[in-house]
């Protein structure tokens, strides 16, 4: 135990002593590193690495020596007998090692001082060399400048010498010419002297000339000296100007260099600003495109919501006022006046006009005129229905409406002698719940067709100027030329689900043989703008020149289902169930209480699309116009033909129901004159894809079954942008109650007609 602890202490002491040497060398290295110049970094790094390796080698040698001595001490301890001798020897060894280490320390300190002196000498030498290099560099630059100046001076002197040489050559040439002239003059004078006589006068003249010549020569000599002086002055000015020119050229070069740098900097700034402007313009275009899309989508959704609210409110008010005959106020964009009780028959007309006004007008297209004719047909049929309801059964007489080819309708009462009625007993004078059922079925078709119709015109944006095709899943599509096809495509779909107790359209219900059907003609209706201008001769005018004209019984679809309003249908004779749109839920009302069908004991009010106009005594008093007789021959012959044609067309429409929309009956002013009966006419039309099977069955008995159709409309507006596609969906559910009736007995119909008459 003692031996083991002793060995541990010895090893620890030796290890700490071995570590003292590198630790003592660290401050010296740091001092050297701080004192060294920056350009000695590489040399110092190399020296530090070499010193580190040397110190590590020395430490390893010392550790090896310590371990060797410890091993020898342990071996000697094993040989000794007592611990005192071992301790004494060990202490002696430690003292000897301490003396050796002290000597080694003094030696290392001496070597460190010598190395420090050598380093100081080397640093001083290096600094001296650096100073010498700087001096030599400055001297070299100065000598280069002097050499450049000497070269420039030499060049200037050479140029000046060249100019002077040219001037000297020119002066020599000029002097040679003058000398030749003088010699020529002298020779001429000599010849003259030789040839002329030696007279005193001539001699005196020659002397005078000689004097003059000498004077002229002296003057020329003075001029020559003056010219030389001027040449010297000009040369001095030329040297000055050359020096100024050189200075200016140098200044120009310096300015060019400076301005080139500035221009480059400005060009870089301009490029940077141009890139930023382009990026800002792109972001602005994206933002403006998104804003336009959002505005279009917002306006479309707001228009749809307002349209549905207006449809629900106006149709609920109109239908309720149509039965109780009270004035109402229409909250529409185009009709805001309050109607009087006399004009109660115009409610359904105004409803159809509001629905038509909600659609975008396709001006300039060939489909516009048939759509207007269709709306006029609906309006006039509704006017006839409401006028018949207001007059009541006691004011009615057998009468027919004869539509001439010129567009004028004449109402002629039936003459018993000249024109007997079409059916004996006049069963058309006996309205019952079937007429009301027919009217409500017409409203139901209008509602479904309006739901399938196109949207209201969206606010035009600058970006969209091309035509847009709004596809309606089903029978057709509407064309709206106001928008672009790739901007905000609007899609609509209609899903129709029928109840369990619905009567299939191919059941045994047949139309009554006593209701003639006008011929089917497309595009023959008068335009909607001229509806109030048509008059009937002999008929009671309603309001100011607005005749109640009856139109076709079926609805024509152009490129898609026509529009309709009237989500809210009020029932008489039973309490309403639910307040959603004033419509009943699935499950059905009890028999005899559906869609405003009145009981048999109540006074009948006739509502149909093919009602005859009849003239009563009250209207005769008000209008003050005498009745006119019926054309009997035309009426009797055309009743049978139209019944046959109608039944054939009904069969064709049943077969083609799944392929396209039903045609519209719109007799115009050029159509043949046809008599109209008071009972409704059943037309099975529409497409099965849209669920628009609206077959109004005629029956005098209460309805046996009630059919419910649930029309679910989903309209989606897709917004296309550069990053993503966002879809907005709006869903409206309309539950519509339709009354199906079975075939009644002809005998029972005749009895009821005679009793009602």
UniProtKB/Swiss-Prot annotation:
Residues bearing the modification N-acetylalanine: 41
Stretch list, region Head: 1-39
Biased composition annotated in UniProt, kind: Basic and acidic residues: 528-658
Sites marked Cleavage (by CASP2, CASP3, and CASP7): 432-433
Post-translational changes noted in the entry: Proteolytically cleaved during lens cell fiber differentiation with increased fragmentation as fiber cell age increases.
Site residues by UniProt (Cleavage): 40-41
Region Coil 1B, annotated ranges: 84-183
Modified positions (Phosphothreonine) in chain numbering: 628, 674
Region (7 X 14 AA tandem repeats): 532-622
Annotated InterPro entries: BFSP1, IF_rod_dom
Tail: annotated segments: 320-756
Swiss-Prot/TrEMBL Sequence repeat ranges: 532-545, 546-552, 553-566, 567-580, 581-594, 595-608, 609-622
GO molecular function ontology, one term from the record: structural constituent of eye lens
Region annotation (Coil 1A) ranges: 40-74
Domain IF rod: 39-319
Described purpose of this protein according to its UniProt entry: Required for the correct formation of lens intermediate filaments as part of a complex composed of BFSP1, BFSP2 and CRYAA. Involved in altering the calcium regulation of MIP water permeability.
Subunit structure: Part of a complex required for lens intermediate filament formation composed of BFSP1, BFSP2 and CRYAA. Identified in a complex that contains VIM, EZR, AHNAK, BFSP1, BFSP2, ANK2, PLEC, PRX and spectrin. Found in a complex composed of PPL (via C-terminal linker domain), BFSP1 and BFSP2 in the retinal lens. Within the complex interacts with BFSP2. Interacts (via C-terminus) with MIP (via C-terminus) in aged lens fiber cells.
UniProt similarity note: Belongs to the intermediate filament family.
Name listed for the protein in its UniProt record: Filensin
Organism field: Bos taurus (Bovine)
Gene name per UniProt: BFSP1
């Amino acid at each position: 135990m003692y031996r083991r602890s002793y060995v541990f202490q010895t090893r620890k002491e030796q290890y700490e002593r071995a570590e003292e040497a590198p630790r003592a060398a660290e401050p010296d290295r740091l001092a050297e590193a701080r004192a060294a110049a920056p350009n000695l970094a590489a040399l110092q790094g190399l020296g530090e690495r070499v010193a580190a390796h040397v110190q590590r080698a020395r430490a390893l040698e010392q550790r090896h020596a310590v371990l060797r001595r410890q091993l020898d001490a342990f071996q000697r301890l094993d040989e000794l007998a007592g611990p005192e001798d071992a301790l004494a020897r060990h202490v002696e060894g430690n003292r000897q090692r301490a003396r050796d280490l002290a000597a080694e320390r003094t030696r290392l300190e001496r070597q460190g001082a010598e190395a420090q002196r050598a380093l100081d000498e080397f640093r001083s030498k290096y600094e001296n060399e650096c100073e010498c290099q700087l001096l030599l560099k400055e001297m070299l630059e100065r000598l280069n400048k002097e050499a450049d100046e000497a070269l420039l001076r030499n060049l200037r002197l050479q140029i000046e010498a060249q100019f002077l040489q040219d001037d000297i050559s020119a002066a020599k040439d000029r002097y040679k010419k003058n000398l030749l002239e003088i010699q020529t003059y002298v020779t001429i004078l000599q010849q003259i002297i030789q040839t002329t006589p030696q007279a005193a006068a001539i001699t005196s003249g020659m002397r005078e000339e000689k004097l003059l010549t000498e004077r002229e020569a002296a003057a020329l000599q003075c001029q020559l000296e003056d010219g030389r002086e001027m040449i010297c002055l000009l040369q001095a000015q030329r040297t000055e100007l050359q020096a100024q020119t050189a200075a200016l050229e140098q200044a120009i070069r310096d300015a060019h260099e400076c301005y080139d740098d500035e221009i480059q900097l400005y060009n870089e700034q301009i490029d940077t600003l141009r890139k930023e402007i382009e990026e800002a313009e792109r972001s602005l275009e994206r933002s403006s495109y998104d804003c336009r899309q959002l505005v279009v989508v917002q306006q479309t959704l707001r228009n749809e919501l307002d349209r549905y609210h207006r449809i629900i409110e106006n149709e609920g008010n109109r239908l309720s006022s149509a039965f109780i005959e009270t004035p109402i106020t229409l909250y529409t964009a185009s009709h805001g006046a309050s109607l009087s009780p006399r004009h109660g028959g115009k409610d359904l007309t105004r409803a159809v006009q509001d629905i038509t006004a909600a659609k975008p007008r396709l001006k300039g297209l060939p489909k516009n005129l048939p759509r207007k004719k269709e709306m006029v047909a609906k309006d006039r049929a509704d006017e006839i229905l409401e006028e018949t309801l207001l007059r009541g059964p006691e004011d009615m007489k057998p009468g027919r409406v004869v539509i001439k080819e010129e567009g004028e309708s004449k109402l002629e009462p039936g003459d018993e002698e000249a024109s007997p009625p079409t059916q004996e007993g006049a069963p058309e004078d006996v309205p019952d719940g079937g007429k009301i059922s027919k009217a409500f079925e017409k409203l139901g078709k209008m509602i479904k067709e309006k739901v399938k119709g196109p949207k209201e015109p969206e606010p035009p944006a600058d970006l969209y100027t091309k035509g847009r095709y709004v596809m309606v899943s089903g029978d057709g599509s509407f064309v709206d030329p106001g928008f672009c096809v790739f901007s905000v495509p609007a899609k609509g779909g209609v899903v129709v689900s029928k109840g369990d107790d619905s009567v299939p359209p191919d059941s045994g219900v047949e139309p009554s043989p006593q209701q003639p059907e006008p011929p089917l003609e497309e595009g023959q209706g008068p335009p909607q703008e001229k509806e109030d201008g048509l008059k009937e001769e002999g008929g009671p005018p309603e309001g100011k020149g607005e005749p109640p004209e009856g139109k076709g019984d079926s609805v024509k679809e152009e490129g898609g289902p026509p529009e309709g309003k009237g989500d809210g249908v009020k029932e008489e004779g039973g309490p309403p169930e639910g307040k959603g749109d004033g419509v009943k839920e699935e499950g059905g009302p009890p028999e005899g209480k559906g869609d405003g069908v009145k009981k048999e004991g109540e006074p009948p009010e006739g509502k149909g699309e093919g009602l005859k106009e009849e003239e009563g005594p009250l209207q005769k008093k008000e209008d003050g116009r005498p009745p006119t007789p019926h054309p009997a021959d035309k009426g009797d012959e055309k009743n049978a033909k139209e019944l046959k044609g109608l039944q054939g067309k009904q069969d064709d429409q049943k077969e083609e129901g799944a392929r396209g929309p039903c045609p519209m009956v719109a007799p115009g002013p050029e159509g043949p004159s046809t008599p109209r009966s008071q009972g409704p006419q059943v037309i099975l039309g529409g497409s099965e894809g849209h669920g628009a099977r609206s077959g109004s069955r005629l029956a005098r008995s209460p309805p046996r079954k009630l059919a419910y159709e649930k029309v679910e409309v989903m309209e989606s507006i897709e917004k296309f942008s550069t990053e993503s596609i966002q879809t907005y969906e709006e869903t409206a559910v309309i539950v519509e109650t339709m009354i199906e009736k079975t075939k009644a007995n002809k005998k029972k119909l005749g009895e009821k007609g005679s009793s009602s008459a």
